Curated annotation (Swiss-Prot):
GO cellular-component term (any): plasma membrane
Organism of derivation: Streptococcus pyogenes serotype M5 (strain Manfredo)
Cross-referenced InterPro entries: Membr_insert_effic_factor_YidD (IPR002696)
Membrane topology: Peripheral membrane protein
Name of protein: Putative membrane protein insertion efficiency factor
Family of the protein in this entry: Belongs to the UPF0161 family.
Length: 86
């Protein structure tokens, strides 16, 4: 199942994403975040990726938002604040 999810995201990155201009407000991009989340957390990573996509809109601050080590649907705010100070 994990491999199928990874292949699906990579297919999106290769064939669908290039059809529109870059618009992700975060680093890494939402699709790269989803890949990392699936690799780290298995199928739970899908939920993390979906939560990330739902946070990607103009009413939320942009910036660095890496996949947390522990499963969480919330933004990794500590890392984001530390990155802004650096």
């Amino acid at each position: 199942m994990k491999k199928l999810l990874i292949v699906s995201v990579k297919a999106y990155q290769k064939y669908i994403s290039p059809l529109s201009p870059p618009s992700c407000r975060y680093k890494p991009t939402c699709s790269a975040y989803m890949l990392t989340a699936i690799e780290k957390h298995g199928t739970k990573g899908i939920l993390m990726g979906i939560a990330r996509i739902l946070r990607c809109h103009p009413f939320v601050d942009s910036g660095v938002d890496p996949v947390p080590e522990d499963f969480s649907l919330m933004r990794n705010k500590n890392t984001s604040k530390n990155a802004e100070k650096a």
